[in-house]
UniProtKB/Swiss-Prot annotation:
Keywords: Amphibian defense peptide, Antibiotic, Antimicrobial, Disulfide bond, Secreted. Antimicrobial peptide. Disulfide bonds join C11-C17. The keyword Secreted applies. It comes from Rana dybowskii. It is found in: Secreted. This is Brevinin-1DYe.
Length: 17
């Protein structure tokens, strides 16, 4: 839930998935 959203945001911001 929250962890998934946070990881998604970091992925979008840093472009590092």
């Amino acid at each position: 839930f929250l962890i998934g959203m946070t990881q998604g945001l970091i992925c979008l911001i840093t472009r590092k998935c």
